[in-house]
Amino acid sequence: TECEYWMESVEAGNLYVNRGVTGAIVNRQPFGGWKKSSVGATAKAGGANYVATLRNWNQMKHFLPMKEAADEWLKSVGGLAIDPTGLSVEQNLQRYRRYKKGLLVRIENGTSKDELDFLSWLKNDLGVMTRLSSDSLITGLANLVVESAEEFAQHAKEFDRVRWLSAEIPPVYELMKNGISCDRRPITLRGDIEVSRWFLEQSVSITQHRYGNTNAGPKPVCSGLKL
C-alpha cells in the first residue's frame, strides 16, 4: 500500500501515519537518533537503548560468546517491529533500519583479532556497510584503507557515521563541521548491547481507527529489519 511504501522509503527517526506529528513520548515514541539529531555515543531519548548509553561497558575479549548474545538479540528484538504499549487505537512500533551510506570505522594495529572478527561478521553476515581505515597496514586485511586522520575526516563525508576504535585522537571538530557523528566507545563484550549500535532506531506511530471506529481506516503492515 501507499502507507507501507512510504514507511519503507522515508528517512526519519520518527514516522507518523494518519495522525499528527506531536509525539516524543517515553517508551511509546522515543525521539532522535537520526542524522543531526544524533551526536556521538547516543540512542533514542526515552527508548529501550537510552539507559545503556549512560554507563560504561567492559570491552570485548572473545567474539563467539558475544556473537551468541547478538544473534539472540537479533531474533528477539532487532529483526522485529515491537509495540511495547499494545493500544487498540494506535500502533507505536520500535524497529531498526540500516544506515544508507554505511559506517567508516577507524582501527589500528592494536585492534584484536576478535574485534576484527566481529567487524567482519557485521559486514558479511548482517550486511552492515562498513569501510575499515587505519594509519598503517594491518596484516591480513586486504580491504583496509591506509590514511591519516585528516584524510579520514574528509572521506567520512561519504558515510552516515563514524566508529572510532583507535587510540588516536579523533578529528571530532572536522567531523562535526560536516555533520558526521563520531562514536568513540570501544566494542563491548555485551553482544546484545553492541550490535544495536550498528543500526538506526526508528519509531513508527500508526493510527488504527477512523473517527473512533477501530474497524475502519487503513491497516498498513510495518516490518522489522530484514536480516
Protein language model annotation of sequence segments:
Residues T1-L227:
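Conserved C-terminal structural/oligomerization subdomain of aldehyde/semialdehyde dehydrogenase
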